[in-house]
UniProtKB/Swiss-Prot annotation:
Changing residue 1177 to R: In SCOLIV; uncertain significance. GO terms for biological process: regulation of post-transcriptional gene silencing. It comes from Homo sapiens. Keywords: Acetylation, Cell junction, Cytoplasm, Disease variant. The modification N6-acetyllysine is found at residue 819. This is Focadhesin. Required for the maintenance of SKIC2 and SKIC3 proteostatic levels in the liver. May be involved in the regulation of RNA degradation by the exosome complex. Potential tumor suppressor in gliomas. InterPro entries: ARM-type_fold, FOCAD/RST1_DUF3730, Focadhesin/RST1, Focadhesin_C. It comes from the Eukaryota.
Length: 1801
């Protein structure tokens, strides 16, 4: 039968062939049995095989009929659907004829749709997919793409003949194929024709359809097409063209029923806008889509997304060629004309910049354009601009009820974000925030996104002045960053000039124009505008200034500038004088600018112009132009284009007599260059002299401007160039002409240098307005002096050098006594000579020719001192009854040991040098011995002295104790100087006892001798100490007395190293006063105990211990003094003379205190002493002598300090004179009288001077008269010695009178008298006393200007010319006289330079505590207090007393008395001084100020100080190698402050949180994490701090993940997300290992894993819904992607490169905007991160090294999208889908497994 059928098939008749197919079908059914379905496993019968074979026949009738037969078998249920379909698909690849097969597939699909769709009630879209169960047509097309015409034919028939009831199902079953055809990423060209042709078929209008709504089929097709649009590829020209056609066709179809398709039309309009941009970039054409948009506007009207499209149009216009602009302009006009109430949206102002760009370029472009119908581009642009300028704006922004979920390009995200930001920026504070953020990003941005330019232009056009200055600033900086948009901005600025504004704003806009000349291409445009302005006569001055500014940017404008300057010189009759004046000033200013900017290029060209202006402007009211050109000349001289001397020679005829203040000021500024341009020629030196004279003359000018300029110019000159001849006559001292100057010698050799004190006299001549300039001048003097300060001055000041300016007579005393000592043969004279030797023994130092000491002679000198020391220990006489010697003997030993120690030390070093020279020692060994020589000498002297005292008399032991105590002080000072030299602690030497232990041993020895019950803590110098078996002290009375008085020598050591001993010693000495239970049995010892306590207290006063100690120490001092005074005035006590002397010593030093309480106390006790003298007639002569001496000392000190008046002092002096007259043989009375006369004389008491002139000749006459009684002669000797200042050390008098030649003559006369007595007198006792007094006088004369304190109390050791010394003297005067006599304003002028220069230099040693304490306590005001503290702070490093005083003022109660500014300074400067005060003081400062200011409830709570406190704390924590205790305190303070900071962060307080983060930055990770641990109560501040640390790279990014688990449960998660967004962006900007791209990528991948765990509920959270938690985490993911993809999105969003833009809260007052992350701008920024995520993700994954992780990102997106339904909100799912679709340009997306999954197939 098969053969028969075959023959029928071959018969060429269609009827026969058709019948044959019927027979074949019947045969198939017969062979297979009618009851069984044909399926895959059915036996292949001949008939069935033939049927399949003929389906591919070349005969169209046969193959068609066979294919239809197969379909019929399926339809009649004789064959399985899958069997037939698969069979057909198997045939397709190999057959030549596919028509029948494809038609059969269509029929099968229609049948399947009918069967499965149930009449459209069931969705059958999922029957087929694209990949796993592919649609049959996809399979066919992939195998036979050449069959596309058959496809087109069959698909056309399929859709056109689709039964109405099957329309929905048919579209659903065809959907996978259509998705594949149009969305396949490769967009194969083989399918292109099918795509295009089929689209017309799909979208052709239905002939019979309802006018109101489309047919079901049309609805289904159009909805499918709308869904396809976001997946279209727009990468290249072909793809873009196809996509454009697709979207346009879809839009046209939608427009047939605009009401029905309103939402889709709106969305497609936006898609069309987006794809227009791509089309414009790739094809240069977009008019068709623009016309479509215009049609949509007409139909949609108010439903059209006007504002978004306006933004899009603005962007398009900026990049559209002229030929494409007309349609866009028409569209814009249409958009603005369809708005209701004729009110246009404010966003229309965005069009201003593009419109102006068109208008400004029309003339050129119209030349090359083809004539077109209708209005021209220019007319359209003008119409549009006119419409926008009507300012009839809608109040509200258009509300969008729709949003494109999946836009076809990234443009939509940009315009939507721009629209949202524009919406918020109606508030000026939000606009200011955005501008500040943009400004912060410009330095790191190379290309500025066009939307940002548009927004800026919008702000520029709209702003009425609130933010205009900021906008112009950002515009300028934006032009610097990206010059490509400058041509667009220039017309906007010109447009803004036409709007009504404040005049100053017009000026700002005009001067912004030249700043935009950042590229040569922009210059022409700007130049034309400026030239246009110049055509208006009134604007020519401004034009010249603008041209000059433009020239500063681009030198190529110089010819034009020159031309315009020349034109401006031409006089014009049409303008008034005012305009001419403006032109002249403008020209002068331009000359100045040219000279300043490019002096070498064009400076020479300006000389003629400068000369012209100077010649023309000579009138008083023409000073301004002349001054301006002189400033230009200043620049030329500075650049050395012209010679300043030659210039002045040329100008001086015109200007030397000029009196105009402005000219004089400018000339002074010009002359400030003279020092820096110095030339080594006589002419220049003469010129400099002339200039100095000019400047000094004008310092006294009545005009403050001139005087200020003169002083400021003088500050540039060297201090040595000023002479006393320059000073004003009123303060000019007499020229010192030396007596020895011969007549024929040159007078130029006279010293004309200015004494430092003379500069201070300028204060009295200087008006208040000139004081600041004088202050600058003083600062210059101080700085120069410190720069040139000899290094040796620091050491000599600490060691105490001898005065070098004493007369020859005084200098000859030591040699005289030494000679007497060496030639003496009288044993009775030996003790006296030894005493004299003690006071003044010294051996001259010999130097080689090159000025270096000779080692051999140094060694010899050291040996001489060693031998003399041992001799003096044995020979110096100690007599307990000699009260006068007891006072001075300790000081004599101290002075001697100072000389001896340094001489022996130098000798030791000399010996070592000799050993090295002779090769007796190795260099290393010698070096070690030299470094330890100071300790070797100490121990050698200690051994020698203790051995000498071992078995000798009590006198020797007493001398030894005084010598060792002095040695302790001397070595301690030497150690201090070594420490300052080595800038730190000295290295511990293992072979020597440490200084601390050695000093402790000496001290314990003294204390054990004074008090046998004292328990020493270490070893003792056992040679001295003998204790009986009963435990009683067996030391001699002399030893006990010497030990007690020696304690006073150690006061400087106590204060520096062991202040705690002071209380112990005071208590010990007080307990042993006469009349006390513990008083010594020996009467002499009781006397010395009182004296010792007085000496000890006086030394404490001298060291200003009360100023640098706490309240407890002051109370103890007063308590001890009270006890001493009680003994002094207790008439029942017999042995209280020592107490009287002690009180005298204390009161003498207390007089110099600035505390009113002390001064009152001194005055009261002085009167009490005076009365006591009156009542002492019945007392012993010694008692009376002591009392008189004490009264003289206290009276002198009180008068010198201004405590008593001259009359009261005179009364006391007369009282003592009467005592002397009544008892002329009493030495004590004569001593007292001589002392008071001397003291009052040097303090300016005229009557005392007169009395002294009478007393001295009388006493000398008594001494030199033969036969005078010895006692009378002795009294006269004491009196005349006192009369020339031998007792000055007791009172520490300071006076210039001591240095007068008159006084020097009296001193010489006394010395000659004493030497004559010693040489001639035959009375041993008289000789002995005379020698002792001569030595005593020598020592007191040498130390008259030196303090015994551990550091000098002033700078008298500096030369007379020292300004610093004079300034410190002024401090002292201020401290003594108070603000009534020394005005604070003048004191500030002197103090400020000292404080300012002190920041860079350490001053020579001085007792800052003594200087500054009075100024701090007296009412000088806040400014002086702060300057005092500044000096303490800067000098605390090198001055222990400055640090001690500072320690007092930074702790309660004194710190509470300081002003707010002073506290602020202390807080900020804490890092400079905090290491130099005690731990207790640091604690007090930290607790009572640094932390207290953060406590709102605290009385100290002060928000103004909080930033300063944290700044100081953070800087203090950066100090290198802090002590453990200090670090602990600072760390603890950081924790406390962090806890006190509010959780919600106010914008104005942001700096505090940054500062606390900087503190944590210095800590270890564990400490920082402990303090900033994130909890629910502190989450915002802790999160911010951690985020800041992460952004700076201090913490790794992984810390964020831990924080997120807490953040997700926070109610205001958005605030935290906003912080995270900024932190992540800043982490990208900061260059750090922890924020590098690999670290960031690692963290983001980890975060993605964490989010996956959350989505699949591997991680759960309490009190937070899963979908909300996932939304938050996806937001965080989005922030990271947007922040790290590029700089465009962050710039548009208003992200900042730092936190500073958010620091100032400049919005309207309100609780929400004032907090960080809560303002409308902040919220929009965060929301729009999600909008920009898709585009940012695509950008990120195209960069290295991110692109390597693309597959991981895609897989992750799929895993989250496919998470359980309840885990992901609809919005998040849409976002992730859009993100996936944005990746369709990537190679990884083109894998079928990826893109089919992404499209949902």
């Amino acid at each position: 039968m098969s053969d028969d059928i075959r023959k029928r098939f071959e018969f060429p008749n269609s009827l026969i062939q058709s019948q044959a197919v019927g027979h074949l079908i019947a045969a198939v059914l017969k062979e297979n049995g009618f009851s069984e379905k044909i399926h895959q496993s059915t036996n292949q019968t001949p008939a069935l095989n033939l049927l399949w074979e003929k389906c591919c026949s070349d005969n169209v009738v046969v193959r068609t009929a066979c294919c239809e037969g197969l379909v019929a078998l399926v339809a009649q249920d004789h064959a399985e659907f899958s069997y037939v379909l698969n069979g057909i698909l198997n045939l397709i690849p190999s057959t030549r004829n596919t028509h029948g097969l494809i038609k059969a597939i269509m029929h099968l699909l229609q049948m399947q749709a009918l069967k499965e769709g149930q009449g459209g009630e069931k969705n059958i879209q999922s029957i087929y997919t694209i990949r796993n169960h592919p649609h049959p047509l996809i399979t066919v097309l992939e195998h036979r793409p050449d069959c596309w015409p058959v496809f087109l034919q069959q698909l056309t028939a399929f859709f056109q003949q689709c039964p109405e009831r099957l329309e929905v199902s048919c579209i659903q079953i065809m959907a996978p194929f259509l998705w594949y055809l149009y969305c396949e990423p490769s967009q194969l060209q083989e399918y292109a024709k099918l795509r295009l042709a089929l689209l017309k078929v799909l979208l052709q209008p239905q002939v019979l359809c309802d006018k109101d709504q489309p047919s079901i089929l049309e609805q289904q097709i159009l909805q499918l097409c709308c869904d396809i649009v976001p997946c279209l590829q727009v990468k290249d020209l072909i793809q873009t063209t196809e996509a454009m056609m697709f979207i346009e066709e879809v839009c046209l179809s939608l427009l047939r029923h605009p009401v029905f398709w309103k939402i889709q039309l709106t969305q497609m309009s936006l898609q069309l806008l987006c794809v227009s941009e791509v089309s414009l970039k790739i094809t240069g054409e977009c008019s068709s889509s623009i016309h479509l948009l215009e049609h949509s506007v007409e139909l949609l009207k108010e439903d059209f997304p006007v504002e978004l499209v306006i933004i899009g149009i603005a962007l398009l216009l900026l990049q559209t060629p002229a030929s494409q602009q007309k349609p866009i302009l028409n569209l814009a006009l249409k958009l603005l004309s369809v708005t209701e109430d004729q009110k246009i949206p404010k966003s229309s102002l965005l069009l201003v910049m593009p419109i102006l760009q068109i208008l400004s370029s029309t003339a050129l472009e119209d030349c090359i354009s083809v004539d077109e119908e209708g209005p021209s581009r220019q007319q359209l642009a003008l119409n549009l601009l006119e419409m926008i300028q009507q300012e009839c704006y809608r109040d509200d922004h258009q509300k969008l009820s729709y949003k494109l979920v999946c836009p076809v390009t990234s443009m939509y995200g940009t315009i939507f974000t721009a629209w949202r930001i524009l919406e918020v920026m109606t508030d000026s504070s939000a606009a200011s925030d955005w501008l500040a953020s943009v400004e912060s990003l410009l330095p790191i941005t190379a290309v500025i996104p066009a939307p940002a330019f548009l927004l800026l232009a919008h702000l520029l056009v709209e702003d009425k002045g609130q933010n205009l200055h900021q906008i112009l600033k950002v515009t300028t900086e934006l032009a610097q960053a990206d010059s490509s948009q400058v041509p667009n901005l220039i017309p906007v600025l010109m447009f803004k000039l036409g709007r009504p504004l404040e005049p100053i704003l017009y000026n700002d806009i005009l001067y912004t124009l030249p700043k935009l000349g950042v590229h040569k291409v922009c210059i022409g445009q700007i130049l034309r505008i400026i030239q246009l302005l110049g055509t208006t006569p009134r604007l020519r001055a401004v034009t010249l200034r603008l041209l000059t500014s433009l020239w500063e940017k681009q030198d190529r404008v110089y010819p034009e500038l020159q031309r315009f300057m020349a034109v401006s010189d031409v006089p014009s009759l049409s303008v008034g004088k005012e305009v001419q004046w403006e032109k002249l000033i403008a020209k002068a200013a331009s000359i100045r600018d040219i000279c300043k900017q490019r002096p070498y290029q064009h400076g020479a060209d300006m000389l003629a112009a400068i000369s012209q202006v100077l010649n023309e402007c000579t009138k008083p009211d023409q000073a301004t132009p002349a001054a301006l050109v002189l400033q230009g000349l200043h620049a030329l001289c500075q650049a050395e284009v012209v010679c300043i001397r030659s210039t002045w020679n040329a100008l001086s005829p015109k200007l030397s007599c000029d009196t105009r203040p402005l000219i004089l000021k400018t000339l002074s500024e010009l002359f400030s260059l003279v020092p820096s341009l110095t030339v080594n020629t006589t002419e220049y030196e003469n010129f400099k002299v002339q200039v100095l004279s000019f400047l000094w003359t004008h310092t006294q000018n009545k005009d403050p401007i001139v005087a200020n300029a003169a002083y400021r110019s003088l500050a540039n000159f060297s201090a040595g160039e000023h002479t006393i001849l320059h000073l004003p006559e009123k303060i000019r001292p007499e020229i010192p002409i030396p007596e020895e100057l011969d007549d024929d010698e040159d007078v130029e050799d006279v010293d004309l240098s200015v004494p430092g004190s003379c500069y201070l006299k300028l204060l009295s001549l200087t008006p208040p307005l000139v004081l600041p300039a004088l202050e600058e001048f003083f600062t210059s003097l101080v700085k120069q002096e410190m720069v040139n300060m000899p290094r040796g001055i620091y050491h000599s000041a600490l060691k105490g050098g001898a005065r070098s300016d004493q007369g020859k007579t005084v200098a000859g005393i030591p040699n005289f006594i030494l000679k007497m000592y060496e030639t003496n043969k009288q044993p009775g004279l030996k003790p006296g000579l030894a005493g004299g030797m003690l006071f003044c023994y010294d051996v001259s130092m010999y130097q080689s020719k090159d000025g270096k000491p000779l080692n051999r002679l140094m060694a010899s000198r050291g040996r001489s001192f060693k031998q003399t020391s041992l001799a003096l220990v044995h020979e110096v006489h100690i007599q307990l009854s000699e009260w006068h010697r007891a006072i001075f003997l300790p000081q004599a030993w101290l002075a001697y040991m100072n000389r001896a120690y340094h001489a022996i030390l130098q000798g030791r070093l000399g010996e070592l040098e000799l050993q090295l020279k002779h090769g007796k020692e190795e260099p290393e060994e010698v070096q070690y011995k030299k470094s330890t020589a100071w300790l070797w000498v100490r121990d050698m002297l200690t051994d020698e002295i203790t051995k000498a005292a071992a078995k000798e008399s009590p006198v020797v032991k007493g001398n030894a104790l005084l010598a060792l105590s002095s040695l302790a002080v001397v070595v301690s000072r030497h150690e201090a100087s070594l420490s300052s030299d080595s800038d730190g602690l000295l290295e511990v030497q293992p072979n020597f006892l440490s200084m601390k232990e050695w000093v402790s041993m000496v001290l314990d020895t003294l204390l054990v001798i004074v008090d046998s019950h004292y328990q020493p803590r270490g070893q003792l110098l056992s040679w001295f100490y003998y204790k009986s078996y009963s435990g009683e002290n067996t030391a001699s009375a002399i030893a006990r007395s010497a030990a007690a008085t020696a304690l006073s020598l150690l006061v400087p050591v106590f204060i520096i190293s062991c202040k705690e001993k002071v209380e112990e010693i005071l208590n010990m000495l007080t307990a042993r006063l006469p009349g006390k239970p513990s008083a010594d049995e020996s009467q002499a010892v009781q006397i010395h105990m009182g004296l010792a306590l007085g000496m000890f207290l006086s030394r404490l006063c001298e060291e200003k211990l009360s100023d640098i100690s706490g309240q407890e120490m002051n109370l103890l001092l007063m308590k001890s003094l009270d006890a001493l005074e009680n003994c002094c005035f207790d008439t029942s006590l017999e042995y209280n003379t020592g107490c009287i002397l002690g009180v005298g010593l204390v009161l003498s030093l207390m007089s110099h205190s600035s505390q009113m309480q002390s001064r009152v106390h001194v005055a009261a006790l002085l009167r009490k002493l005076s009365a006591h003298v009156d009542d002492s007639g019945s007392q012993s002569r010694t008692f009376q002598e002591v009392l008189a001496y004490t009264l003289s000392c206290v009276c002198t000190s009180a008068f010198s300090a201004g405590i008593i008046e001259a009359t009261e002092a005179e009364d006391v002096m007369n009282k003592l004179r009467l005592l002397v007259e009544n008892s002329q043989q009493t030495s004590g009375f004569a001593l007292a009288l001589g002392n008071i006369v001397h003291g009052l004389s040097v303090c300016g008491h005229g009557k005392a001077e007169d009395l002294g002139s009478k007393l001295l000749p009388a006493w000398i006459r008594i001494v030199l008269t033969e036969g005078t009684p010895t006692m009378l002669c002795l009294a006269a000797l004491h009196g005349m010695v006192a009369l020339v200042g031998s007792e000055g050390d007791v009172m520490q008098l300071k006076s210039e009178a001591i240095q007068t030649s008159h006084f020097q003559g009296r001193l010489n006369e006394v010395i000659r008298t004493l030497t004559q007595v010693i040489s001639v007198s035959g009375v041993i006792g008289l000789q002995s006393n005379a020698v002792w007094l001569l030595g005593h006088l020598h020592l007191s004369t040498l130390s008259s200007s030196q303090s015994r304190a551990s550091v000098p109390t002033d700078y008298s050791y500096l030369p007379e010319s020292s300004f610093i010394g004079a300034a410190i003297g002024f401090f002292i005067t201020g401290g003594k006289k108070g603000p009534e006599s020394v005005p604070p304003s003048l004191l500030k002028v002197v103090m400020k330079p000292i404080a300012t220069v002190g920041e860079s230099y350490q001053y020579p040693p001085v007792n800052w505590a003594a200087l500054l304490s009075p100024l701090m306590r007296l009412n000088f005001g806040e400014e002086i207090q702060q300057l005092c503290l500044e000096i303490m702070v800067t000098q605390a490093q090198s001055s222990q007393n400055a640090a001690a005083l500072l320690g007092l003022w930074v702790t309660p109660p004194l710190i509470h008395s300081l002003s707010l500014n002073t506290k602020r300074y202390l807080l900020i400067s804490a890092p400079l001084w905090i290491k130099h005060i005690s731990d207790e003081q640091i604690l007090g400062f930290v607790e009572n100020l640094m932390v207290a200011v953060f406590k709102a409830a605290s009385p100290l709570g002060s928000p103004e100080l909080c930033p300063s406190a944290l700044h100081g704390l953070s800087q203090a924590m950066k100090l290198p190698s802090p002590a453990h205790h200090l670090w602990s305190l600072l760390s603890e303070a950081t924790g406390k402050i962090f806890d006190l900071l509010p959780n919600k962060i106010r914008r104005k307080d942001l700096e505090l949180y940054i500062s606390i983060a900087k503190c944590l930055l210095e800590m270890t990770d564990d400490d920082a994490n402990r303090i900033a641990q994130v909890t629910k109560s502190n989450i915002e501040k802790a999160a911010f701090v951690k985020l800041y640390l992460v952004s700076q790279g201090r913490f790794p990014l992984v810390n964020l993940t831990d924080m997120l688990s807490v953040a997700v449960q926070h109610r205001e998660k958005e605030v935290l997300a906003w912080m995270i967004l900024h932190s992540l962006y800043q982490a990208r900007i900061v260059s750090h290992a922890n924020t590098g791209v690999l670290k960031r990528m690692e963290w983001l991948l980890e975060l993605m894993g964490y989010i996956r765990n959350v989505a699949y509920q591997s991680t759960s959270f309490h009190n937070t819904a899963l979908d909300k938690a996932l939304d938050f985490f996806l937001l965080i993911f989005a922030t990271a992607v947007v922040a790290w993809a590029d700089h465009t999105a962050p710039l548009l969003l208003g992200l900042s490169a730092s936190w500073l833009p958010w620091h100032q809260e400049n919005g309207p007052a309100g609780p929400v905007p004032s907090f960080l992350g809560r303002s409308p701008m902040h919220r929009v920024t965060l929301q729009e991160v999600l909008t920009l995520l898709p585009n940012s993700m695509a950008l990120l994954l195209q960069k290295e090294p991110w692109k390597e992780q693309t597959q991981k990102f895609i897989d992750w997106l799929f895993s989250i999208m496919e998470s359980p339904k309840e885990a992901l909100s609809a919005q998040s799912r849409d976002l992730l889908k859009a993100t996936l679709l944005s990746l369709r340009v990537l190679p990884e997306f083109k894998k079928k497994a990826v893109w089919t999954r992404a499209y949902g197939w």
